[in-house]
Regions:
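Bacterial Sec-dependent N-terminal signal peptides
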Residues: 1-20
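Extended carbohydrate-recognition surfaces in non-catalytic/accessory domains of CAZymes
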Residues: 370-454
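Extended, low-complexity, turn-rich repeat/linker tracts enriched in Gly/Pro/Ser/Thr and Asp/Glu
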Residues: 288, 455-459
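Beta-rich carbohydrate-recognition and catalytic domains
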Residues: 20-118, 122-201, 205-263, 271-324, ...
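Short strand-turn-strand beta-turns centered on an Asx-Gly dipeptide
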Residues: 461-467
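Conserved small/polar residues in nucleotide/adenosyl-binding loops
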Residues: 477-483
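Residues within well-ordered beta-strands of beta-sheet-rich folds
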Residues: 122, 219, 434-436, 448-450, ...
Length: 485
């Protein structure tokens, strides 16, 4: 009888342990409601020209300042630039950012001479917590993408994981010290199949409970081919350390992946909500999605077994600044507002850092530079310096005159917020928008005006010619212009 009871207890305990690995759907829905950010604020950091791309935000707090590191690629295309460097910016309100300078620069003659894309380590993992970076042995730490190949990421040569540190003030721009060799490489004797092609972004967390047997837990994504299916993709794995310098790969890697050829699962950003760890991550080229890249989340009780969220994605392409890719999360909650930082890429392949929020926080004034377009069709952007004034409105009575103001479009006298921009204020009426521009007429060329609208209808007049009343709220209006007045 004792043996039978022992066997029953053993089966029950095993089942309970297995069941706990799956985060219940009800809890996943609670997490989604807590972290969703339906209001897109716009760009926070954008390059000043078309020969730089900004990527991979990491946001943290130091004293009364918010800081953000990000990586900068100094090329227009994938092969014409040298590679990544790491920069830092500061903010008072998480929305408006000032660039301070570099923290990881190119260094000639080293293993990482052309690629130095960094990610600060040991952040406070508590959701809504301090978001400060912890020190270990009197230093702040950072892992980074490193390599000698030029170009965007691993386009010419594999990338490895490097380690940097500083004893200085992390709220200032100064060069961090670095090791003379990578801490993880695809050539290591214990390198695993899922990372044999290249290694990418990494972030190190300080797990003082030593859940996996060591205090320092690195999540990193890497490229490799599955040994059984031969599917090529990016997956997320773990490495462990007791001293930040010597690392051992977790035997159960990869811990998180989506097995479809060419699919990317990466850039894990983890925070703890009560007894549940939440991993914000991005996926790209997922066959089940119509868009190319997006941000979503998974949850875990043990840092290893992750339950994927099956509901609506957190960030998807929906604006003219993120229409190609909206991906690579860094999420913080401060004073009751959730800020979701992500990398925004448009169809011109301009790349910057954008923000979405859980509450309406206004609209950013940061814009990408005008794209360079070299093809048979020449496109001239006419979004700047429009004069506008209201001619009639529901909140104004009787005859009135108001002074015109100069704005850049898109512009609205009312505020529109919410998913699909369906919720708006109470201002109804008519506004005038006027712009003077000159287009040189060339023989054999046709000229068009395209309007993307935010109102309901627009009556359009060009050079005194009335083009009529057009609905331009949902899509766009395309007008063919005469080449003679």
């Amino acid at each position: 009888m004792k043996k039978l009871l022992l066997a029953v207890f053993s089966i029950t305990a095993t089942f309970s342990l297995y069941a706990q690995r799956e985060v219940p759907q009800e809890r996943m829905e609670q997490i989604y409601e807590e972290v969703k950010t339906p209001y897109k604020y716009g760009l926070a950091v954008a390059p000043a020209d078309n020969y730089h791309k900004i990527d991979c935000p990491t946001v943290f707090r130091q004293g009364d300042k918010w800081l953000m590191t990000y990586v900068v690629y100094n090329g227009k295309g994938g092969t014409d630039g040298r590679g990544y460097e790491t920069w830092i910016a500061e903010s008072d309100n998480l929305l408006e950012w000032r660039t301070l300078g570099r923290v990881l620069s190119y260094r000639d003659g080293k293993w990482d001479c052309n690629q130095r894309g960094g990610f600060p380590a040991l952040p406070d993992m508590e959701w809504g917590g301090s978001y400060e970076l912890q020190t270990y042995k009197g230093r702040h730490w950072m892992t980074y993408i490193g390599g000698e190949g030029t170009g965007y990421e691993a386009v010419k040569a594999p990338l490895y994981v490097g380690l940097a540190w500083t004893k200085g003030d992390i709220s200032t721009a100064h060069e961090w010290e670095s090791l003379d060799k990578p801490i993880l490489s695809i050539h290591d004797k214990d390198a695993q199949w899922w990372e044999k092609l290249t290694q990418y972004k990494s972030t190190v967390y300080w797990d003082k409970d030593k859940t996996l047997g060591a205090p320092f837990v690195m999540y990193y994504n890497a490229g490799g081919r599955h040994p059984e299916t031969d599917l090529k993709g990016e997956r997320v794995g773990i490495a462990l350390s007791k001293d930040m310098k010597t690392w051992k790969r977790y035997s159960g890697n990869p811990v998180f992946a989506h097995e479809a050829d060419g699919t990317i699962t990466g850039d894990a950003h983890i925070q703890k909500m009560g007894d549940v760890y939440v991993m914000f991550y991005f996926s790209a080229f997922e066959p089940s999605r119509k868009y190319k890249a997006f941000n979503t989340f998974a949850a875990s009780y043990d840092l290893v077994n992750w339950t994927d969220w099956k509901g609506a994605d957190l960030i998807i392409p929906s604006k003219n600044y993120d229409e190609l890719f909206a991906h690579k999360s860094y999420v913080v909650k401060h004073d009751g507002v959730v800020y979701h930082f992500y990398c925004a890429v448009n169809n011109a392949e301009q790349r910057g850092i954008a923000i979405a929020t859980s509450k309406p926080m206004g609209r950013s004034t940061v814009r990408f530079p005008k794209p360079e377009i070299k093809n048979r069709r020449q496109i001239t952007t006419l979004n700047e310096d429009w004069k506008t004034w209201i001619t009639e409105a529901t909140h104004l009575k009787g005859n009135f005159m108001m002074r015109a103001k100069t704005v850049n479009i898109p512009h609205n006298w009312d505020d529109y917020y919410g998913y699909r921009q369906l919720t708006h204020g109470n201002l109804h009426g008519t506004a005038m928008y006027v712009k003077d521009f000159t287009a040189d007429v060339k023989s054999g060329k046709r000229y068009f005006l395209r309007f993307d609208g935010v109102g309901t209808y627009a009556t359009i007049t060009v050079n005194g010619k009335d083009f009529g009343r057009h609905p331009i709220a949902v899509s766009y209006t395309h007008l063919t212009l005469p080449t003679k007045r």
